[in-house]
Amino acid sequence: IGCRKCEEVCLSDALDIMGKDVSVSELMDIIMQDYDFYISSGGGVTIGGGEMSLQTDFAVALLRECKKMMINTAVETQATTNVANYEKLAQVVDQFLIDIKHIDTTQHKALFGIGNENVRRNLERLMDLGANVVIRMPLVRGYNDSYDAITGAINYAMALSKRGNLQRIDILPYHQFGRNKYQKLEMIYPIKNDPGYTPEELDRLEAFFKQFDFEIRLVRH
């Protein structure tokens, strides 16, 4: 499983390798092409996924090289893997962007197959380590956009911010940008009849967020 030999021997060329194996030094050569821009703009390197913490050792090695060159580092993660991964990452990551898809662990398990205990554990450990963290909550109609789900996530973020450097929570309203990926993979798109939130609905959400003494950023697409 995962050996990719099927792609090499596929008679009809129906399977293609999307991506390639690279070393840390090869990636650094690519990163350094934009070094002047990173330094002048304050930008940097963000590792995402899939789930980047499944390759923690490689990510740490790459980000350590970035730090040697004074390049800002960030990771996007669901924070569902072992806490030891995040203890390693905290040594080389300037900014964690961490998803909370549902604050209620029972609902989280019903929707995604696992609870959110690891997410909470890793967030709390990062707070203790002094890491800079932004929580991100994808908002999907009928799944996690109830009053209890939204306020629960915000209240949890506010409580964490008193424990460490949790900077804000980003709310990411559902959109259909991923539909083409499903088509390319010949998969059925699971949300067929929801075009996303209207501008008026987003305006009401922003007005609702103003009652909280905490930075909540609604990301409009």
Where are the regions a protein language model picked out?
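Conserved beta-strand termini and adjacent loop/short-helix elements that scaffold enzyme active sites
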Residues: M18, L172, V219-H221
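Active-site anion-handling motifs in enzyme catalytic cores
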Residues: V22
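A charged helix-plus-loop insertion that forms the helical arch/lid used to bind
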Residues: L185-P195
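Conserved AdoMet/S-adenosylmethionine-binding subsite of the radical SAM
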Residues: S25-M28, M32-F177, Q183
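Cysteine-centered iron-sulfur cluster-binding motifs in ferredoxin-type domains/subunits
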Residues: I1-D13, E51
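Iron-sulfur (Fe-S) cluster-binding segments and ferredoxin-like electron-carrier domains
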Residues: D13-G19
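A cross-taxonomic marker for long C-terminal extensions/tails that follow the last structured domain
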Residues: E200-H221
